Amino acid sequence: MWELDPKTLEKWDKEYFWHPFTQMKVYREEENLIFERGEGVYLWDIYGRKYIDAISSLWCNVHGHNHPKLNNAVMKQLCKVAHTTTLGSSNVPAILLAKKLVEISPEGLNKVFYSEDGAEAVEIAIKMAYHYWKNKGVKGKNVFITLSEAYHGDTVGAVSVGGIELFHGTYKDLLFKTIKLPSPYLYCKEKYGELCPECTADLLKQLEDILKSREDIVAVIMEAGIQAAAGMLPFPPGFLKGVRELTKKYDTLMIVDEVATGFGRTGTMFYCEQEGVSPDFMCLGKGITGGYLPLAATLTTDEVFNAFLGEFGEAKHFYHGHTYTGNNLACSVALANLEVFEEERTLEKLQPKIKLLKERLQEFWELKHVGDVRQLGFMAGIELVKDKEKGEPFPYGERTGFKVAYKCREKGVFLRPLGDVMVLMMPLVIEEDEMNYVIDTLKWAIKELEKEV
């Protein structure tokens, strides 16, 4: 089936397929990768060329491609039933997964609402938080507090609480109102020169000043420990915990977006664990199925859930749902994903790799066109600059990050930058020699810039 020559596939790809976050005029002018199969941390394109998947297929692959246990989970469920609705009915894998997610999540997050991707998980949290206050009879709450440089997905609600001008500015007239605190990393670096307790205290005071002076705040929403899509911008120590303490003090809800950070990316199952934070909502996606199928989840508390209980005629229930909510196949592979974490001791084996990554990242500071190096757990960003001394960036239109990524492709490493930030988000199961090859290749590709600039 589908035995087509590569040239035909390339032609049809450019003729019919509109790709996400892609300037299609440029895409049509270039040679692009069309992947056909994967095994472990490797991908093969339609010409049989092999690449290390150094971005985990956009940060979602956990245990590698074509994992036998995950494959089997999908096939076993497929032989039973692929999908049944969860609107007023249920299915076995969705029930089992909900129980398991509650068991591994911060204490108090006892209810699970499914969706298909991280933006939807955030959208659901936004609507639930707003609806919660309505059901409680509290009037006038219609404002969210978020962060500059935030990214929570691309649906209108998620964009409203976002803060990346390049991605979100076009849609500003469509969006609901928010209050934005400064990006913690950028604020700390500009004012204090580093991430430090003094900066944490400064940011928390700004938040407290808002919370104690307003009664219209629905919730505070932020990513967990790092603003990943903004270029891997980590939070100062204790910031997330401090925010949680303030939301409790001022009776405000807290939404934590663990879509990018969840399922081991920061070294623990969820970043919230590292600061002892249990929010009112936790949004999950990406790695929840090990990178196999679209699935996301919004976890919340009994307090929130109970506010939606009532007689049918009261119409308190949550009017939200998708066709594939709690899909049987996706929930089955998500369960297998969590079993692999336990059986293969994934998080335990990850710790020396995080240490190796930290050590190897120091080498990038020596490079002429590297202006900053950032890391949280197994997530890293290397920022490229035209002039290190002046902090001058490359012009956006030069696509310098993509040029470096294309160089890496020549040596069999698949990367996708965030602007001019080279992102390393490797599958958790990558071996240390494979890590070293990725890092060596990226260093070489950045050095090649010196010949062009």
Swiss-Prot record:
It is found in: Cytoplasm. Substrate binds at residues 151, 286, 321, 416. It catalyses: (8S)-8-amino-7-oxononanoate + S-adenosyl-L-methionine = S-adenosyl-4-methylsulfanyl-2-oxobutanoate + (7R,8S)-7,8-diammoniononanoate. Pfam families: Aminotran_3 (PF00202). Coiled coil: none annotated. One of its GO terms (molecular function) is pyridoxal phosphate binding. The modification N6-(pyridoxal phosphate)lysine is found at residue 286. Pathway: Cofactor biosynthesis; biotin biosynthesis; 7,8-diaminononanoate from 8-amino-7-oxononanoate (SAM route): step 1/1. CDD domains: OAT_like. Keywords: Aminotransferase, Biotin biosynthesis, Cytoplasm, Pyridoxal phosphate, S-adenosyl-L-methionine, Transferase. Its cofactor is pyridoxal 5'-phosphate. SUPFAM superfamilies: PLP-dependent transferases. Belongs to the class-III pyridoxal-phosphate-dependent aminotransferase family. BioA subfamily. Homodimer. This is Adenosylmethionine-8-amino-7-oxononanoate aminotransferase. It comes from Aquifex aeolicus (strain VF5). The gene is bioA.
